[in-house]
Curated annotation (Swiss-Prot):
Function: Acts as an overall regulator of starch mobilization. Required for starch degradation, suggesting that the phosphate content of starch regulates its degradability.
GO biological process, one term: starch catabolic process
Gene behind this protein: GWD1
Compositional bias segments (type: Basic and acidic residues): 284-306
Organism listed in the record: Arabidopsis thaliana (Mouse-ear cress)
Record-level Gene Ontology MF annotations: alpha-glucan, water dikinase activity; ATP binding; metal ion binding; mRNA binding
Keywords: Acetylation, ATP-binding, Carbohydrate metabolism, Chloroplast, Kinase, Magnesium, Metal-binding, Nucleotide-binding, Plastid, Transferase, Transit peptide
Protein name per UniProt: Alpha-glucan water dikinase 1, chloroplastic
EC numbers, comma separated: 2.7.9.4
Subcellular location: Plastid, Chloroplast
Catalytic function, reaction form: [(1->4)-alpha-D-glucosyl](n) + n ATP + n H2O = [(1->4)-6-phospho-alpha-D-glucosyl](n) + n AMP + n phosphate + 2n H(+)
């Protein structure tokens, strides 16, 4: 209708104005008046409306009368491929009809009138037909009216009513309708006739209308601009170009001339130009658009390889890591109360004399079924219990194989049993003794092993209770390796949140929509619980994703409802990701298990598209119909696998084994297909002529499925970010995804490069492209973005593709040299660092690999030795990450798994599977490939022998040496320990410790091994280690050399060999002289004597003034022997002393837990005023800073450090060590050496006789960055080690480069060193047993060795190492015996902080 007509009608007051959304888009010739269509004059023949409807010319009237209105429609050219027509009913009611005239044919009808009983009475017109037909697709609540018309109710919206029809049958070329208000019995017509709406058809479009190519190019460009300048592949480019041609043909069919189109397009195009270009001539602009058909592309990448950008790797460091905090809420500390069933089961298990063979809990709504099996002497006992409130009958049988029901023998039937055909009905026995509520039970005992299982279902009244539409089944042939445990306390978890999840699981299992909405509701609570809250959500979602939880139970849900719930959850997770950087790694993992979700249209496509596939390919029955029903009922990630299995089946020329292989490889069995609410019974059985069409359509459908279910699918993720439009087909809804804004320049080309190389055998270019894409994307992930979720899923997909690519590339590394393997390691490490919250150590490992690669390419000496240190550090980083995951995730997995009845085997390996799913597993595999290559190149061998002693003993395999350090073996034992930290004691009876771990040669455990004549060695070869572990319990002979360990199995007769006699040697006779308080609280170094201080203090005092001038000795004072005993005897400390006496008695009775309590108690000591004054005076007179000058708080820090040194007399290691050699612990006295801390650049330890070889002509030393505590304490990794001949001190030889990730640094401070009378006794190595405590906390710094001149500057390295060797040689000459020396280097100056005789 023209604007003039509307204006006239408004002025005449005949119609009420109505603001429709598209009222400015008036109709084209698609809409016609009744006289333009011959069918309209024959309404009477259709016998649809009765006799009262008569043709009344061209005026619009109603049956009940009304004012006629003249109506003359006009065709108006519209840019938009939609057309709209407005009518007036009764002279004052507006009616608007719009038709979408492109691929999707929709008829939108709006009327400015409302009624609860307003209907559209309608039908369709086929080609050259007059009578109505009923379309197969109609809106909800449509009714069939006498099989001759459809009646569809309008939907009210404000003061208007509206309705949308979707027409998918291409044979329909028009619809006709009337409007009927049932409550008023009133019909609205078009001048007494049907409203007749023509629909565009493919035939119309394909008429031979010629459109100039230059106009098609401009239209294609404008379409591309409208759709957000998306990235198109060649196929999509062609499709868009032809769509542009079709749009222009349609306009010409409506009457537009070529000149009209040209004028309109050029005007439209000009509006997009800058003001500066508006003066360009028409012909110039036309020529410009001829070359603008597609967006310009920057060809940054050739077809073979990309050029990676140079980046400062330190800019990638990400330190947002959540502190591990145990929730402090009351609910977290309270143990979970056992359920009635758990109490019953616990009591039953205690009654049984045999361990539980298998145990399982089936969770039902509001109740549960517990089944456990025990076996003894050929008898199998089955226990079934349930907490159902109403009486229950067990309908059961026995089976010899899965799926069968066999009549049980009559002589084994329990009481209240009634045999029925092929089964038995047994009424359960009600038990309530000592239980909070009644339990119904069943017990069965079977002789022999002829039966393998027991199928059953329950009957309660009129209800049959099954296991998700399948029978329950008790398997008593297969023993559970991990019988489900009860983790009732929930320690280390967000227990309150996990309890809530467990309570809501019965609701969550109804459908994915329920589960995702419940998870979304819990996000705020998870946020409050912190890291452990999101760990709980991850565990729950991971149990879901791995099919440990029920996906759908008695509930139908539309795909669009699932995708909407997904969308809600992932939107919330996206918001948390943006606001809480410390949880990002966990959130990434949660999102990868949930999937992306999408707006309703994306989910709806799952439902619509399968119908189109069935119709187009003539496969409406069998598996396609069953799958269609499942998809409509409750789509899930299984559908991605089913779709892939169908495509693989078709590609294999319909080989059913291929179909089943794809399903089974992805965890879908026949039983699972049958377990769906809409079960899939049939196997595929397609015809040859269906092959091409199904492959094409299922391939397109896979994209729809992955868009909802597969967050980490690369192609889907790229499309979501680059944007795409899919107009659908027939009745399918269209989908338009706009491109993400703000992507880096050239990014589409980079992603196109990735897609083009994603399946190539040579994975190196692909890996480079993937990592470059992740690096380019990273800045956008670190700030807010309206499409952050899509960027995250793209990054997850790129990350996942790196992992799959590297696994595919293992084969090409089989014959590769170390340079290639190192490069691949650096790529995978980069990928892991980009996915980690706390990646500083990983980044420095990455820098180390790049430095090693440069050394290798330059063929520098020691490149392999240096690369080995980086490899060792990388292993440590992986181990640290695994331990972190274990600490955060495993407690939640165990607690929630117990609550939800998850299979124990899935719970026990939960964290392990999480790690395997990431880049860490690929990195570990590559490192293991490279290790033997580097060891061979660097001539390192398979062993490092720390204490070479020949021994014979029985092998025992343990995880950690720490767990057995206080054990006593009654026969010679060779311990193979996966983990040795360096601080442990070696247990009595052990003759050897073998480990893959790498404690320092000078660590406490190394010193103890050498002193105790115990063989101690590190094994670097995983094959040798596995062989040793396989000899658990066997008697072995070990024959170590300085670089190898030869071992063999021997007979018991060889136990008498001299080499193993050290086990029988009695501990040396050692005694301590108890020291007394000499009346002094503090003394200077000049007063150090054996009566007042230990060897540590005396040696420092002795060195002063005797060492070369270039060797510094720190100023020292001491709290002498007896001060501790004097302080604790003071009246002010009476309570502490009394408690100490009680705890010592407890300790003597064997309670080792008292040691920790003693140390804690001693921190309550009060310093006597005399001690404070005397220590202050002594320190100041020795030119040492007095802490109290900086405030009372600083003195309190110093006093706390002194007390910790005294308390270390009762640390576990020291206490058991003195017990082992039968020293009287009460006679052990502790002086405290007080020194100013030198904030070291490096710390070192020297042994002036090589401890590994015993060569006295050779100095051995180790150096670390920062303070020496990382060298002598239990800090992972190796230090820099070197040897130096005493006759050539200027030529140190590096044996190994450092792999310690952490260095300790401290402000100017004071350190309080333990100096007991039990250290350095002949025959007993007491050094290192007791603590030295600085008054300030050290700062832990992650080390970057690529910027350390000790590694990178060979001349600096030579000078520092030579100075250390010369200092050691000078001190040895001063004492005349081999020395164990500790020192530091600060600003090039060397200081010795202590020395003692080398053991």
């Amino acid at each position: 209708m023209s604007n003039s007509v509307v204006h006239n009608l408004l002025n005449r007051g005949l119609i009420r104005p109505l603001n429709f959304e598209h009222q400015n888009k008036l109709n084209s010739s698609v809409y016609q008046t009744s006289t333009a269509n011959p069918a309209l004059g024959k309404i009477g023949r259709s016998k649809l409306y009765g006799k009262g409807l008569k043709q009344a010319g061209r005026s619009l009237v109603t049956e009940t009368g009304g004012r006629p209105l003249s109506f003359v429609p006009r065709a108006v050219l519209a840019m938009d491929p939609q057309a709209a027509e407005k009518f007036s009913l009764d002279g004052n009611i507006d009616l608007l009809v719009e038709v979408t005239s492109t691929t999707v044919r929709e008829v939108n009808i709006q009327i400015a009138y409302t009624s609860d009983t307003l209907f559209l009475h309608w039908g369709a017109i086929l080609d050259n037909k007059e009578n109505w037909v009923l379309p197969s697709r109609s809106p909800d609540r449509t009714q069939n009216f006498k099989n001759s018309a459809l009646r569809t109710p309008f939907v009210k919206s404000g003061g208007n009513s509206h309705l949308k029809l979707e027409i998918d049958d291409p044979a329909i070329h028009a619809i006709e309708f009337l409007i009927f208000d049932e409550s008023r019995n009133k019909w609205y017509k078009n001048n007494g006739q049907n409203f007749h709406i023509n629909l565009p058809t493919e035939r119309n479009v394909k008429q031979n209308v010629s459109v100039p190519e230059d106009l098609v190019q401009i239209q294609a460009y404008l379409r591309w601009e409208r759709k957000g300048k998306q990235m198109y592949n060649p196929e999509k480019e062609k499709e868009e170009y032809e769509a542009a041609r079709t749009e222009l043909r349609e306009e010409m069919m409506r009457g537009a001339s070529v000149e009209d189109l040209r004028a309109k397009l050029l005007k439209k195009d000009n509006s997009n130009e800058s003001p500066k270009s508006n003066g360009t001539s028409s012909s110039g602009r036309e020529e410009k658009k001829k070359v603008s058909k597609q967006p310009e592309r920057k060809k940054n990448y050739n077809t073979d390889k990309i050029q990676r950008k140079g980046r400062d790797l330190t800019k990638l460091i990400y330190k947002h890591v959540a502190d591990f905090v145990e929730p402090e809420s009351k609910s977290s500390s309270e143990p979970r109360s056992l359920t009635t069933l758990e109490i019953y089961a616990k009591a039953k298990e205690e009654q049984e004399t045999t361990p539980v063979f298998s145990k399982k809990t089936f969770k039902l709504e509001g109740s549960a079924i517990l089944v456990f099996v025990t076996k003894l002497s050929g008898k199998t006992k089955i226990h079934v219990a349930t907490d159902f409130k109403e009486p229950v009958t067990l309908h059961w049988a026995l089976s010899q194989k899965g799926g069968e029901w066999l009549d049980p023998p009559s002589d084994i039937l329990p009481p209240n049993s009634l045999p029925v055909r092929g089964a038995v009905d047994t009424k359960l026995t009600i038990t309530s003794t000592d239980l909070p509520s009644p339990v119904q039970t069943f017990e069965l005992e079977i002789e022999g092993d002829s039966y393998k299982g027991m199928p059953f279902v329950l009957n309660a009244g009129e209800r049959w209770i099954k296991n998700n539409d399948s029978d329950f089944y008790v398997d008593f042939a297969k023993e559970e390796k991990h019988v489900q445990k009860d983790y009732g306390d929930g320690k280390g978890t967000a227990k309150h949140l996990l309890d809530k999840i467990a309570d809501l699981e019965s609701e969550a299992q109804k459908s994915f929509m329920h589960r995702f909405n419940i998870a979304a509701d819990l996000v705020d609570e998870a946020k409050s619980a912190g890291q452990l809250g999101f760990a709980g959500i991850l565990v729950w979602m991971r149990f879901m994703a791995t099919r440990q939880l029920v996906w759908n139970k008695n509930y139908n849900v539309k795909p669009r409802e699932i995708s909407k719930a997904q969308d809600r959850l992932t939107d919330l997770l996206q918001d948390v990701y943006a606001s809480y950087p410390e949880y990002r790694e966990l959130l990434r993992m949660i999102m990868s298990t949930v999937g992306r979700g999408g707006e309703g249209d994306v989910g709806q496509r799952i439902r619509d598209e399968i119908l189109v596939i069935q119709r187009k390919n003539d496969c409406k029955g069998g598996i396609m119909e069953e799958w269609h029903q499942k998809l409509h009922n409750n789509t899930s990630p299984d559908d991605v696998v089913i779709c892939q299995a169908l495509m693989d089946y078709i590609k294999s020329d319909f080989d059913l084994s291929v179909y089943w292989k794809t399903l089974n490889d992805n965890g879908i069995t026949k039983e699972r297909l049958l377990s769906y609410d809409r079960a899939i019974h049939s196997e595929p059985n397609f015809r040859g002529e269906q092959k091409d069409g199904l492959l094409r359509d299922l391939g397109h459908y896979m994209r729809t499925l992955k868009a909802v279910h597969s967050g980490a699918d690369l192609e889907s993720a790229i499309q979501n970010c680059m944007g795409y439009q899919d107009d659908g087909e027939g009745f399918m809804v269209g989908v338009q995804i706009n491109p993400v804004s703000g992507l880096p320049s050239g990014y589409p080309d980079l992603l196109r490069f990735v897609l083009e190389h994603v399946e190539e055998k040579n994975v190196e270019p692909l890996l480079e492209g993937l990592l470059e894409a992740r690096q380019e994307l990273r800045p956008l992930l670190l700030k807010s973005h309206d499409r952050l979720k899509d960027l995250l899923f793209l990054d997850l997909a790129l990350d996942s593709t790196v992992r799959t690519a590297i696994e595919r590339g293992y084969e090409q590394l089989n014959d590769a040299g170390p340079e290639k393997i190192m490069y691949f390691i650096s790529l995978v490490l980069e990928n892991l660092a980009l996915s980690s919250d706390d990646n500083e150590d990983l980044i420095y490992c990455l820098k180390g690999w790049q430095f090693a690669l440069d050394m290798c390419k330059s063929k520098k000496d020691h490149w392999a030795l240096y690369a080995k240190s980086v490899l060792d550090r990388s292993r440590l980083a992986l181990a640290s990450k695994a331990e972190r995951y274990l600490e955060i995730l495993q407690p939640s997995a165990e607690y929630l798994g117990s609550c939800l009845g998850v299979d124990q085997s899935a719970v026990s390996i939960f964290t392990e599977e999480i790690i395997r799913a990431g880049s860490a597993a690929a990195l570990s595999s590559l490192v293991n490939r490279l290790d033997p290559v580097l060891r061979k190149t660097a001539n390192l061998g398979s062993w490092q022998v720390i204490s070479p002693v020949e021994v014979v003993g029985y092998v025992i395999v343990v995880d950690e040496l720490l767990t057995v350090q206080n054990k006593t073996y009654d026969r010679p034992t060779i311990i193979v320990a996966n983990r040795v930290r360096g601080e442990e004691e070696i247990p009595d009876g052990a003759v050897a410790v073998l480990t893959p771990d790498m404690p320092d040669v000078l660590s406490h455990v190394s010193v103890r091994a050498r002193n105790g004549k115990i063989c101690f060695a590190t094994c670097f070869d995983s094959g040798i280690l596995s062989d040793l572990q396989g000899k658990d319990g066997k008697l072995l002979s070990l024959q170590p050399t300085s670089a190898d360990v030869v071992y063999k199995e021997v007979n018991d007769s060889e136990l008498s060999s001299p080499s193993s006699d050290n086990l029988e040697d009695a501990p040396p006779s050692i005694s301590l002289v108890k020291k007394q308080f000499a009346g002094r609280y503090a003394i200077s170094s000049e007063e150090f004597t054996s009566d007042l201080v230990g060897a540590k203090s005396r040696n420092i005092g002795y060195l002063k003034g005797k060492v070369p001038s270039w060797v510094g000795i720190p100023t020292s004072v001491a709290l002498p022997f007896g001060v501790f005993e004097k302080v604790i005897s003071e009246k002010a400390n009476q309570a502490v002393n009394d408690k100490l006496l009680v705890l010592k008695k407890t300790l003597d009775e064997g309670d080792q837990g008292a040691l920790k309590e003693i140390r804690q108690t001693l921190l309550g000591l009060v310093a006597p005023p005399e001690l404070v004054e005397e220590l202050k005076s002594t320190m100041k007179s020795s030119d040492m800073p007095w802490p109290g000058d900086e405030g009372e708080q600083r003195w309190e820090q110093a006093w706390a450090a002194i007390k910790k040194v005294w308390a270390s007399k009762w640390n576990e290691r020291a206490y058991f060590s003195t017990r082992k050699v039968k020293l009287d612990h009460d006679y052990l006295c502790m002086a405290v050496l007080v020194q100013e801390v030198i904030n070291a650049d490096y710390a070192f330890v020297i042994h002036t006789t090589n401890p590994s070889s015993g060569d006295s002509s050779e100095i051995y030393a180790e150096v670390v960055k920062g303070l020496g505590e990382t060298l002598v304490g239990a800090y992972p990794g190796r230090s820099l080690s070197f040897i130096c001949k005493k006759n050539n001190l200027d030529s140190p030889l590096v044996l190994g480069y450092p792999s310690k990730p952490i260095g300790l640094f401290i402000r100017r401070s004071i350190i309080f060193r333990s100096d007991s009378n039990g250290e350095d006794l002949e025959g007993y190595a007491g050094a290192g047993l007791y603590d030295s405590v600085p008054m300030d906390e050290e700062d832990q710094v992650v080390l970057d060795y690529t910027t350390d001149p000790l590694i990178t500057d060979l001349s600096f390295q030579k000078k520092v190492l030579s100075d250390i060797a010369r200092a050691g040689d000078a001190i040895e000459k001063l004492y005349g015996t081999a020395q164990d020396i500790e020192g530091v280097i600060r600003d090039g100056k060397l200081y010795v902080v202590q020395t003692r005789p080398q053991v």
